[in-house]
């Protein structure tokens, strides 16, 4: 068989360009397919890493118009204790965010800014925390906390983290203590679970115990029998006195299985819940499969093109005594090796560029063997025609002269080439449409100006003690035009904060953003009726509301109308702007189109985000350095992370891109 291989190598040398292009095509196709398959498998098995996933449910509230996952603490506690079918429950505050910690003392003091989640101790009984050291029961002690392994190694190195102290230099929301002792270290969670790798510590036993207005908590329950979930909700809905609580008049409960949360598109509007688009994932997987199909067809055409050049030597070997089965086996083996070589190179590329794959390179067996199966199928299909056709022609016909493809073989090649070009053109057109959609999302007008505006989050110390000092020093700097404040980054997240008010005897709902009086003018948001807030409005005792145009159409509001907000403040409509989008366009067809947007002005509101507008032509590097140094001077615990408003969309749609 050496002559067959020698002839094959000679043929490859003669067709270097074609052989190289085929290998490159298969490598790229397999690499793309496996990278998409890794993501698809990760999403398909989302949250299934937890052994009790089928019995874990999240408590949701539903009305005739909407559904949401956040709960009032006493309401969640009432539900968790309402049925013997609920074996365990946990209540989580996902809003704490990052907290500035210091470790050590005096000269060897080190600082870190790490995410914190407060919760009730039942979380370790519901979810699978894989203990590395310490004890999971440490959450029963309000002084202790759980750390992910990566964080423990980053902070404490290879030494044991158990018993080490973390001192918070700022308040931890929903917790009374600032000093935490590491009681346990758990193995990091993968990306495909709702639980984040954060510092877990117990929720304060007195926080929000009697607060029936604070919808900030998530509640998960563990059931003994998942089939009883509807009965549990039905019994609770009948027994609980909803009518006694103004905020619960139209509410009913619903349990959502943990594994179903990821693809619940109606939950995309909250950033602390991981979500995905199944349709988008399926389309991406289908596209990657088509790319592999194109590469395989190209491979088949290549092997068919080699038939006339190899058929004579193949049949000479048959005359010399090689059996047809043996010849066909080796021809198929060549195709298999060709495909497997391409697949092996694609795996090496995945290892080299693992950082480019969402969630890192975690190839499960099903993905590896799926790709291997496709490579074997490619070899089988590509080797079928040469193996069968080239060995079935009578030797006397072949040895009498040159030989080409039969009319059927030529028609087959023409059909394959035609199909290949058709699929390629379809993919190119689809890619152009997808690119256009992404560009539309990224360039979508949010209704406000974002040029030369940098946003930085301030810690509580600066917000409460040094805000005036911070503001005056910024306004006195030559490269800064003005500074305003808001409760969040406008247009930077999928989340909208919902509010409600009593107006003319009816309840109206809207999304809102707390802002300083000069925020709208700084962001170039103008009023087309009434006016926007001004600096002197900061002294006003009532809340001043500036709505977008949807409020006029849907709520029949007018300038000067007064209302009572659900959080207890008197409010007055100051004016109306054009339509403004304060969150992403992910949900533009649903939630953003449903409710109007209000900018709420009152200086007493908590607004940790500073919007700093730079002068045209200002040296951004020098300005940011000045701000950083000033923040470090005012509060060493503030670790500023600057972001320009015009970059929000790039980060927001990173997954689509």
Regions found by a protein language model. Name each.
Residues 39-53, 197-206, 246-248, 267-272, ...:
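Short juxtamembrane loops and helix-capping segments at transmembrane helix boundaries
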Residues 33-100, 110, 138, 208, ...:
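Membrane-proximal extracellular/periplasmic loop immediately following the first transmembrane helix
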Residues 1-5, 9-10, 14, 50, ...:
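Membrane-helix entry/capping segments
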Residues 119-132, 145-276, 472-653:
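Mid-to-C-terminal secondary-structure elements
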Residues 5-21, 25, 297-338, 392-403:
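Intracellular coupling helices
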Residues 31, 35-36, 254, 335-395, ...:
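Small-residue-rich transmembrane alpha-helices
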Residues 12-15, 22, 43, 59, ...:
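Generic structural signal for small/hydrophobic residues in well-ordered secondary structure
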């Amino acid at each position: 068989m050496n002559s067959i291989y020698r002839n094959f190598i000679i043929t490859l040398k003669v067709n270097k360009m074609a052989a190289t292009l085929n290998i490159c095509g298969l490598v790229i196709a397999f690499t793309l397919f496996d990278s998409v398959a890794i993501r698809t498998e990760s999403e398909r098995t989302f949250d299934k890493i937890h052994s009790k996933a089928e019995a874990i449910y999240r408590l949701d509230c539903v009305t005739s118009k909407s559904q949401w996952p956040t709960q009032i603490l006493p309401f969640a506690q009432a539900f968790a204790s309402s049925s013997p079918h609920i074996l365990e429950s946990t209540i989580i505050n996902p809003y704490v965010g990052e907290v500035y910690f210091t470790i050590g003392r005096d000269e060897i003091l080190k600082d870190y800014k790490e995410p914190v989640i407060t919760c009730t101790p039942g979380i370790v009984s519901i979810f699978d925390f894989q203990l590395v050291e310490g004890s999971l029961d440490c959450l029963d002690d309000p002084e202790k906390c759980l750390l992910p392994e990566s964080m423990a190694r980053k902070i404490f190195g290879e030494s044991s983290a158990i018993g080490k102290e973390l001192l918070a230099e700022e308040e931890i929301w929903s917790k009374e203590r600032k000093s935490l002792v590491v009681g346990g270290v758990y193995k990091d969670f993968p990306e495909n679970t709702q639980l984040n790798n954060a510092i877990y510590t117990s929720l304060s036993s007195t926080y929000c115990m009697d607060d029936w207005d604070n919808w900030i908590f998530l509640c998960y329950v563990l059931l003994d029998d998942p089939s009883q979930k509807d009965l549990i909700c039905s019994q609770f809905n009948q027994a609980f006195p909803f009518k006694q609580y103004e905020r619960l008049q139209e509410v009913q409960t619903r349990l959502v299985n943990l594994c179903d949360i990821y693809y619940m598109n109606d939950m995309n509007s909250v950033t602390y819940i991981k979500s995905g688009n199944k349709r988008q994932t399926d389309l991406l997987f289908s596209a990657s499969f088509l790319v592999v199909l194109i590469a395989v067809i190209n491979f088949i055409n290549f092997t068919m093109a080699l038939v006339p050049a190899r058929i004579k030597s193949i049949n000479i070997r048959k005359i010399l005594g090689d059996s047809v089965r043996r010849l066909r086996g080796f021809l198929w083996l060549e195709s298999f090796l060709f495909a497997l070589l391409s697949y092996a190179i694609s795996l090496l590329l995945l290892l080299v560029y693992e950082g480019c794959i969402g969630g890192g390179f975690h190839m499960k067996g099903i993905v590896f063997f799926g790709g291997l199966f496709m490579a074997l199928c490619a070899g089988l299909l590509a080797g079928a025609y040469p193996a069968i056709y080239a060995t079935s022609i009578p030797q006397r016909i072949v040895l009498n002269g040159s030989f080409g493809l039969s009319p059927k073989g030529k028609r087959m090649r023409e059909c394959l080439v035609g199909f290949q070009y058709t699929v390629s053109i379809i993919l190119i057109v689809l890619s152009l449409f997808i690119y256009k959609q992404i560009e539309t999302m990224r360039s979508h007008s949010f209704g406000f100006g974002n040029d030369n505006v940098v946003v930085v989050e301030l810690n509580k110390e600066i917000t409460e003690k040094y805000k005036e000092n911070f503001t005056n020093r910024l306004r006195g700097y030559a490269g800064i035009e003005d500074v305003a404040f808001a409760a969040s980054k406008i247009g930077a997240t999928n989340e909208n904060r919902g509010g409600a008010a009593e107006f003319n005897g009816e309840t109206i709902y809207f999304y809102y953003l707390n802002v300083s009086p000069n925020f709208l003018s700084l962001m170039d948001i103008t009023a087309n009726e009434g006016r926007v807030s001004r600096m002197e409005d900061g002294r006003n005792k009532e809340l001043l509301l500036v709505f977008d145009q949807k409020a006029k159409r849907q709520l029949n509001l007018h300038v000067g109308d007064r209302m009572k907000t659900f959080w207890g403040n008197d409010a007055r409509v100051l004016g109306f702007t054009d339509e403004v989008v304060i969150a992403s366009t992910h949900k533009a067809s649903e939630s953003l189109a449903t409710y109007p947007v209000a900018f709420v002005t009152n200086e007493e509101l908590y607004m940790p985000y500073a919007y700093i507008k730079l002068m045209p032509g200002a040296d951004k590097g020098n300005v940011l350095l000045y701000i950083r140094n000033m923040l470090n001077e005012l509060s060493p615990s503030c670790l500023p992370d600057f972001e320009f408003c015009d970059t929000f969309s790039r980060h927001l749609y990173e997954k689509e891109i």
